[in-house]
């Protein structure tokens, strides 16, 4: 039964029916080798998958303004960029310092009210996550590894002295928000619904201290490609004067302040015609860290290597998934220190992240020297990994990795 169909006028149930993770151990071995071109994001696809699913209860209260519209939103699905489009509903849940989150609810999307003395505004006490929902040809919806986002938020909350939702609360809230906004999920092959969970110190605090109250909020927006180049190769410049993170800092968690700190270098790079910035470590200034909002991978023959997670690099969920997919496909993958000079003779370089998935790098400029890759095209390894992961995310192959969560 569809979750909204069970609602009666005037009643305010405290649940939504949400399908649970399906058990991929019953499915055939995942085929990660079949091709799927980068250009498929801009074309209608005819592939489908038939996963099973079962209902579970989500602890979300529906506000009295909740209603359901089954038709797709009237927007230009063929020209989605990575910009914000307001949707219908957002999810809101609060708790006091020292207590636990409970009793979240779906509300009409709109502005929120914060004290000028809120901890998030004065001291940057906040985290965010990002994940996506995809529409399948049978009308069902796929989420990609939402429990990983929940776990990462919990780790970040501990670092930032904040309470956080449990993994189940986080995942159930994501499901509820996606289903409430399902008319905004792009048609197959047109994009995805970007999901943005926020955790912030919303209570008023004047002296430097953890906020007395916290808000967990989720909003969503339909999106296309993150980079303006779309799926064409991007061009990076290495930054060795400004740094994204420092040892002992917060570079390994998804705190909001990490991203404001990269805007100066990123803006300067874009003014020079580059897509983004590749940062080096702040101690030796010679080891790769990450791009402004993406992890970085280097390819040499059958070897793929990426900077190790050591406290200054965000443990990306797409990064983690690509490592597993690459090993499944027979590549040797190393997580280690990567010297900037290793870019000079690399076969390919690519970035990974929720927003970009896999983004091939066409060139990297370091100290005025431009190093091109793949003659301006998409490298074979980047293409293969992109194909394998997106086929799984979009439900075109059965998920033997047990990574997707299906909603009806």
From Swiss-Prot:
Q: Where is the transit peptide?
A: 1-58
Which residues are annotated as modified residue N6-(pyridoxal phosphate)lysine in the UniProt record?
254
Which Pfam families did the record assign? Answer: Aminotran_4
**What protein name is recorded for this chain?**
Branched-chain amino acid aminotransferase 2, chloroplastic
Its UniProt miscellaneous note says:
Branched-chain amino acids are synthesized in chloroplasts, whereas the degradation takes place in mitochondria.
Q: Which residues form a coiled coil?
A: none
Q: Name one GO cellular component term.
A: chloroplast
Q: What does this protein do?
A: Converts 2-oxo acids to branched-chain amino acids. Shows no kinetic preferences corresponding to anabolic or catabolic functions, but likely involved in BCAA biosynthesis.
Task: For this entry, list what GO says about its biological process.
Answer: isoleucine biosynthetic process; L-leucine biosynthetic process; L-valine biosynthetic process
- Which source organism does the UniProt entry give? Humulus lupulus
Q: In which tissues is it expressed?
A: Expressed in lupulin glands and leaves.
As for family, the record states: Belongs to the class-IV pyridoxal-phosphate-dependent aminotransferase family.
Q: What are the UniProt keywords, alphabetically? A: Amino-acid biosynthesis, Aminotransferase, Branched-chain amino acid biosynthesis, Chloroplast, Plastid, Pyridoxal phosphate, Transferase, Transit peptide
Q: What is its EC number?
A: 2.6.1.42
The prosthetic group or cofactor this protein requires is: pyridoxal 5'-phosphate
| GO function terms (MF aspect) | L-isoleucine-2-oxoglutarate transaminase activity; L-leucine-2-oxoglutarate transaminase activity; L-valine-2-oxoglutarate transaminase activity
Which residues does UniProt mark as catalytic? Answer: 254
NCBIfam families from the xrefs?
A: ilvE_II, PRK13357.1
Kindly list the positions annotated as binding pyridoxal 5'-phosphate.
152, 290
Q: Which reaction does it catalyse?
A: L-isoleucine + 2-oxoglutarate = (S)-3-methyl-2-oxopentanoate + L-glutamate; L-leucine + 2-oxoglutarate = 4-methyl-2-oxopentanoate + L-glutamate; L-valine + 2-oxoglutarate = 3-methyl-2-oxobutanoate + L-glutamate
To which pathway does this protein belong? Amino-acid biosynthesis; L-isoleucine biosynthesis; L-isoleucine from 2-oxobutanoate: step 4/4; Amino-acid biosynthesis; L-leucine biosynthesis; L-leucine from 3-methyl-2-oxobutanoate: step 4/4; Amino-acid biosynthesis; L-valine biosynthesis; L-valine from pyruvate: step 4/4
Subcellular location per the Swiss-Prot or TrEMBL entry: Plastid, Chloroplast
């Amino acid at each position: 039964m569809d979750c909204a169909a069970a609602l009666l006028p005037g009643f305010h149930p405290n649940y939504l029916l949400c399908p649970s993770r399906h058990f991929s151990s019953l499915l055939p071995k995942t085929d990660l080798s079949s091709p799927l071109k980068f250009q498929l994001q801009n074309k209608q696809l005819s592939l489908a998958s038939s996963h099973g699913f079962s209902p579970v209860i989500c602890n979300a209260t529906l506000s009295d303004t909740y209603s359901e519209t089954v038709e797709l939103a009237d927007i230009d699905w063929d020209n989605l960029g990575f910009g914000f489009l307001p949707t219908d509903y957002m999810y809101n849940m609060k708790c006091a310092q020292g207590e636990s989150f409970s009793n979240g609810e779906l509300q009409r999307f709109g502005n929120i009210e914060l004290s000028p003395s809120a901890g998030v505004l004065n001291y940057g006490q906040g985290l965010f996550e990002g994940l996506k929902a995809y529409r399948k040809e049978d009308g069902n919806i796929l989420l990609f590894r939402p429990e990983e986002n929940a776990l990462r938020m919990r780790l970040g909350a501990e670092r930032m002295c904040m309470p956080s939702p449990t993994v189940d609360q986080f995942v159930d809230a994501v499901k509820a928000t996606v289903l409430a906004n399902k008319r905004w999920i792009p048609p197959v092959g047109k994009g995805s619904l970007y999901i943005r969970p926020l955790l912030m110190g919303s209570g008023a605090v004047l002296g430097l201290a953890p906020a007395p109250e916290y808000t967990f909020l989720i909003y969503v927006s339909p999106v296309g490609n993150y980079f303006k180049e779309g799926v064409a190769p991007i061009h990076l410049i290495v930054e060795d004067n400004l740094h994204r993170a420092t040892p002992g800092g917060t570079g390994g968690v998804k705190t909001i302040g990490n991203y404001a700190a990269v805007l100066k270098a990123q803006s300067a790079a874009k003014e020079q015609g580059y897509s983004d910035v590749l940062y080096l470590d702040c101690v030796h200034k010679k080891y790769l860290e990450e791009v402004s909002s993406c992890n970085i991978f280097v390819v040499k023959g059958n070897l793929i290597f990426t900077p190790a997670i050591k406290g200054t690099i965000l443990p990306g969920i797409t990064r983690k998934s690509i490592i597993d997919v690459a090993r499944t496909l027979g590549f040797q993958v190393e997580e280690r220190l990567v010297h900037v000079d290793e870019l000079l003779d690399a076969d390919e370089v690519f970035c990974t992240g929720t927003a970009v998935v896999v983004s091939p790098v066409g060139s990297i400029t370091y100290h005025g020297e431009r190093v091109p890759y793949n003659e301006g095209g998409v490298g074979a390894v980047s293409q293969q990994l992109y194909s394998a992961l997106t086929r799984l995310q979009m439900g075109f192959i059965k998920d033997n990795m047990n990574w997707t969560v299906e909603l009806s």
